[in-house]
Amino acid sequence: MLDAYIYAGLRTPFGRHAGALSTVRPDDLAGLLLARLAETSGFAVDDLEDVILGCTNQAGEDSRNLARNALLAAGLPARLPGQTVNRLCASGLSAVIDAARAISCGEGRLYLAGGAESMSRAPFVMAKAESAFSRTLEVFDSTIGARFANPRLVERYGNDSMPETGDNVARAFGIDREDADRFAASSQARYQAALEEGFFLGEILPVEVRAGRKGETRLVERDEHPRPQADLAALARLPALFAGGVVTAGNASGINDGAAVVLLGDRAIGEREGIRPLARILASASVGVEPRLMGIGPQQAILRALQRAGIDLDEVGLIEINEAFAPQVLACLKLLGLDYEDPRINPHGGAIALGHPLGASGARLVLTAARGLQRIERRYAVISLCVGLGQGVAMVIERCR
């Protein structure tokens, strides 16, 4: 089992594609959070051991070690190291898990971990020519999905886009369009309810952005992606992305910009400083599944993580499954024997509502779950994400009282 504690966390608002945060570099987005947490946590910066951030793209401004760039941009000491991890959509959660493992092994007492992604600023990329005077050039938009796919893997596993994998899961598990749209509408409604209750005020750090050519700025304080008007009737009018498919722009997560970071440490450092943690990290798990059915990865990861934590699913008070696509979450729930109307499932809405900046989402889920447990006064939460190329990652946390 793991033995690490979540003491604090922040995230930026999640911006829509080409929206308010599109003018901000990903290392600067993460740096804002690192600086604020270092300043306000109550712990000494000298106690920090490392900064670990997840990032999925790493093809542009987020290349050459996002974490190190972000901590330097934040003004943290140069003696503090930083490393960047990539497990695609679960990169942010994997960063938190790596920090928790290090703390549990006694390799440092305090870590900053999370992730960032600016999908708006993802560059176009192309390979160098393999031969002289080549006339073959292929340009990829690195925002999402595969580029430079290995032909041997394509032959073996196919090269389905992420939405196509959502449709694959829908067909395999009998998820129809109405089911998917109902889940999407529920995600929007749950997000709006949490917003109106002020839940997100405790986790969002507003971001100042450029607003004009004359040096004007404005403060971005709220997520841009949610669509409160997206009821079942509105969702039903949207076309499927692929003929005969279930996935639409309305029942899928967005293309977004954002960052999320949590502060983790051992129990003793909190006791020394008189700071009470939000939650204890108990266990984690990562699994592999067929790439064309990548969306079902959370189900196996959740069960394995719960087994390692020594608890049953019915003991869990809050279940966060990242909403890459509605059919994918519904299939996981079906395999787990759960109903999407179960109040434990994504009670504050999910990525269909607030968006999915790939490298940040895992850390966002950890932060939301830790705060959510405090709100509902339940003991355990489980957090999970599906991962492109066929993986699932999960973490189990326990509320600190």
Regions found by a protein language model. Give the residues of each.
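Active-site pocket-lining segment
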Residues: 167, 203, 213, 282-353
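Conserved catalytic cysteine-centered active-site region
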Residues: 24, 55-111, 143-145, 156-161, ...
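Condensing-enzyme catalytic core mediating Claisen C-C bond formation in acyl metabolism
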Residues: 1-26, 36, 144-145, 149, ...
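Active-site-proximal alpha-helical scaffold in enzymes
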Residues: 86-117, 170-199, 261-268, 333-334, ...
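Flexible glycine-/small-residue-enriched beta->alpha junction loops
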Residues: 110-168
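N-terminal extracellular/periplasmic Venus flytrap/periplasmic-binding protein-like
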Residues: 11-12, 23-27, 31-32, 40, ...
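Conserved active-site "lid/cap" helical segment
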Residues: 1-74, 78-81, 165-177, 187, ...
